[in-house]
Design a protein with these regions (language model features):
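Conserved beta-strand-loop-alpha-helix junction that forms the acyl-donor binding cleft
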Residues: 79-90, 106-113
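Conserved active-site alpha-helix within GNAT-family acetyltransferase domains
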Residues: 61, 85-102
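Conserved glycine-rich acetyl-CoA-binding loop
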Residues: 47, 51-62, 85-87
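Short amphipathic alpha-helical segments
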Residues: 40, 44, 58-67
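Conserved acyl-CoA
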Residues: 62-77, 99
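A conserved beta-strand-loop-helix scaffold within acyl/acetyltransferase catalytic domains
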Residues: 2-49
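Residue-level detector of high-confidence beta-strand sites
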Residues: 32, 101-106
Length: 113
């Protein structure tokens, strides 16, 4: 199972709380996103996650939109690293106004199996 547990996610949030934006539903964290790789003119959004039973309710769109507006309001360019093979997240980002730029990385890996 590749899902990160709620407790593991909560621990990560607490360690870097100032960089995270969270959404709570019924006093429970249901969605998170983090600003990272911040420079004088750029800021990345990463760690976008909504717990499974709360998906398809607009939480991820709301949180990414909020962080994007925060970054742009602070006169920086907001950007994301995406997996082009993930149509769900890509649709979300494009619906907010993000566009694909040139590929920055090519990953080559070897399995440990």
């Amino acid at each position: 199972n590749n899902e990160v547990s709620y407790q593991e996610t909560l621990k990560r949030v607490k360690e870097n709380i100032s960089d995270f934006v969270i959404i709570k539903n019924e006093k429970r964290i249901v969605s998170i996103a983090k600003k990272t790789r911040e420079t004088d003119c750029l800021c990345s959004i990463s760690a976008v996650y909504t717990i499974e039973k709360e998906r398809k309710k607009g939480f991820s769109k709301k949180i990414v939109s909020f962080l994007t507006n925060y970054i742009v309001t602070n006169h920086k360019i907001a950007y994301l690293f995406v997996d082009k093979n993930n149509p769900i997240s890509n649709h979300l980002y494009q619906s907010i106004g993000y566009v694909y730029d040139k590929p920055q990385f090519e990953f080559i890996y070897q399995s440990y199996q």
